[in-house]
A protein has these predicted regions:
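Extracellular/periplasmic juxtamembrane helices and adjacent flexible linkers that interface
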Residues: 2-22, 26-32, 323-413, 431
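Early extracytoplasmic/lumenal segment of secretory-pathway proteins
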Residues: 3-4, 11-22, 26-130, 137-138
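A conserved helix-loop-strand patch within extracytoplasmic ligand-binding domains
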Residues: 128-202, 209-210
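Periplasmic-binding protein-like
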Residues: 135-151, 234-248, 295-328
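Ligand-binding pocket segment of bilobal, Venus flytrap-like solute-binding proteins
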Residues: 211-308
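VWA/integrin I-like adhesion module and closely mimicked acidic/polar interface patches used
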Residues: 294-303, 526-583, 587-595
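Von Willebrand factor
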Residues: 403-473, 500-501, 519-524, 556-559, ...
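Short beta-strand-loop
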Residues: 422, 448-488, 507-514, 531-537, ...
């Protein structure tokens, strides 16, 4: 787990961090933890650990510092010291459902939790029905702030659809997915492409999936199981999903890629629209595409801003609930109540607004209204839908697993000699990597296609540094053969990373299926050790998605502390993908789960 501790420590790293060389990516579904201390001093005997969703984690860190320094007292005269850790909502929900484990989950066990939406409370409650533990106290949650789900679009594209005069909804997204931009007089923009997160881990992905099902039925409340399983509803949602570029576990991945394209004067070349929390659109327009609040108003603003389109056929208000957990003692419950009351005071609510949130009553600040193009300064009524029941929400997630856009993935595994080195736990890196790769096969949909390559350098048995072992084929037909082939890999030779990445992407391009998410996943424990192809700049030019008419994303996984993570990050960023950090081999299984969430 990637952990940040201490008030003076480094800031949270976002999923993609802009650098002069490109975008450096880190694993978003891993916990990023930061504890803060304030001026209340060592006499504060009540310690409260709050776990926050990532998009407001920076702000809660700031406000916890302010609270700790405020000198506030609880009813019994004691004072509390609040510390904050931050975790994506879906990951935190799973941790709470299993029973929080600090070592496994990478953060202290919280006594209070504030996810992005009460949808996660609904899912956690449902999971708790099969457990002998109490997962929630039953207390009514307090909303700290709000932010509606919105469709972020580059302004020229939104205007081409009719924004802001015309009401735009999910049916317009479906129509554009089917007909492309040529239907609106812009064939130069090509296909309509949608950025959307995985609903199992991301609130915006979950909310967008729920909203699409509601739009399919024309309802705004009381969605039923029969309506979720109705063939017409499923066809509608499947049609929306067909336009997805690829799935992600954090919407900042899309925002970072948009910012890079914008910086190169190609803002309309990447995604036509991204389903996100409205607040992230504000951050993007204010120069912070990755959500780093230090850049808010100071980072480079985009040449082509995004506007917030609120679907007229239904969207959800994300309510940022604050709940006390069963792990809290009586004193911690009192501290949680006082901290939440502090957060609802006018000064703190104003800080939420300045960061692009609406206040807990749904009122937009002037900064947000101007930044994202809210009609009537944000006073126009939104077409809000009611959150579905736990049973229906579970059915929506199950349906998405079937209806989502399917993938065509080429898995490229490093079999260089260094993979024989120990990885801990009595196994080699090769053994740990094979185990993780085999386990990951169970995360794909049966209709997803997966192929396998291996690479090192030339050996006595192989005249090329890379070799195709199995071409992509559906998991339902080829899983057993993939398992056998992965388990049969052996390690020798050096690491011909650059030439393999280039060849793998070209192979994926030659077999490109436009109706699928096409991707390459490279797992390596080292750095390039191949003199015949040792020019990183040339590789980055060859795979640069902004310079190619067609491109395939290359997701990289750094496996071992010898892996060249910076270079792997540049490779992935050049293809508008993500690099994942598994330099601690103990986390490789969780890393692979995160990788597969892109598909």
């Amino acid at each position: 787990m990637n952990r940040r501790t201490g008030e003076q420590g480094p800031r949270r790293l976002p999923l993609l961090v802009a650098t002069a060389m490109g975008l450096v990516a880190i694993l978003a579904t891993f916990l990023v933890t930061r504890e803060v201390s304030g001026g209340s001093g060592p006499d504060c005997g009540v310690r409260l650990e709050v776990n926050s969703s990532t998009e407001k984690g920076d702000l809660l860190v700031e406000l916890a510092q302010k609270y700790n320094a405020s000198g506030r007292e609880l009813a019994d005269g004691k004072c509390a010291r609040v510390t904050v850790s931050e975790t994506s909502s879906g990951v935190a929900m799973d941790a709470l459902a299993q029973g929080w484990d600090e070592k496994r989950d990478g953060a202290p066990e919280p006594q209070a939790w504030t996810p992005t939406s009460s949808l996660w409370l609904t899912l956690l409650t449902e999971k708790g029905t099969t457990s002998d533990r109490t997962v929630l106290t039953g207390d009514k949650p307090v909303s700290l702030a709000t932010s509606p789900l919105a469709i972020a679009m580059p302004r020229p594209m939104a205007e081409a659809v009719g924004w802001p005069q015309k009401k735009i909804g999910w049916r317009d997204i479906l129509s554009l997915t089917e007909k492309g931009w040529g239907s609106l007089g812009h064939p130069e923009w090509g296909r309509f492409s949608l950025g959307k997160d995985n609903p199992h881990t991301s609130t915006s992905g979950l909310a967008a999936t729920v909203a699409a099902f509601y739009a399919a039925t024309g309802r705004s409340s009381d969605l039923t199981l029969d309506q979720v399983t109705d063939p017409k509803s499923r066809a509608f949602v499947s049609g929306v999903e067909a336009g997805v570029l690829h799935y992600a576990s954090d919407a900042t991945a899309y925002m970072a890629n948009l910012a890079e394209a914008d910086a190169k004067g190609q803002a309309l070349s990447y995604a036509s629209a991204v389903t996100v929390q409205e607040q992230l659109i504000h951050l993007y327009n204010q120069g912070s595409p990755t959500g780093d609040v230090k850049l808010l108003g100071k980072g480079k603003k985009p040449k082509v801003p995004l506007v917030a389109v609120h679907p007229d056929d239904g969207t959800l208000m994300l309510d940022h609930p604050f709940v006390v957990l069963p792990s809290a003692s009586r004193e911690q419950r009192a501290a949680a109540a006082d901290f939440s009351a502090f957060l609802l005071e006018a000064a703190q609510q104003r800080r939420f607004q300045q960061h692009g949130f609406r206040d807990h009553e749904g009122n937009a600040g002037r900064e947000l209204a101007a930044s994202v193009g809210l009609p009537d300064e944000g006073k126009r009524k939104l077409s809000l839908i009611d959150p579905p029941s736990a049973q229906v929400l579970g059915a929506i997630l199950d349906s998405w697993d079937e209806l989502r856009k399917k993938a065509r993935v080429l898995l490229v595994m490093d079999v260089s000699g260094s993979m024989n080195q120990p990885a801990g736990g009595g196994q080699s890196r090769m053994e740990a990597a094979k185990k993780a790769a085999v386990a990951a096969l169970g995360l794909y949909h049966p209709d997803d296609e997966v192929g396998l390559w291996a690479f090192s350098t030339e050996t006595a048995d192989h005249r090329e540094p890379y070799r195709e072992i199995l071409p992509p084929r559906p998991i339902k037909a080829g899983k057993n053969q993939l398992v056998t082939s992965i388990n049969g890999l052996s390690a020798e030779g050096g690491t011909a990373l650059y030439t393999t990445v280039r060849a793998a992407q070209q192979a994926a391009l030659s077999g490109l299926d436009a109706d699928r998410i096409n991707a390459v996943v490279v797992l390596t424990d080292g750095k390039n050790e191949y003199p015949a192809d040792n020019d990183l700049d040339a590789l980055l030019r060859d795979i640069d998605a902004t310079q190619l008419e067609r491109s395939v994303r290359v997701f990289t996984v750094a496996f071992s502390d010898q892996a060249d993570f910076d270079t792997l990050s540049e490779i992935s960023a050049a293809t508008r993908a993500t690099s994942y950090d598994a330099r601690d081999p103990a986390v490789i299984d969780k890393v692979m789960v995160s990788v597969i969430s892109n598909f």
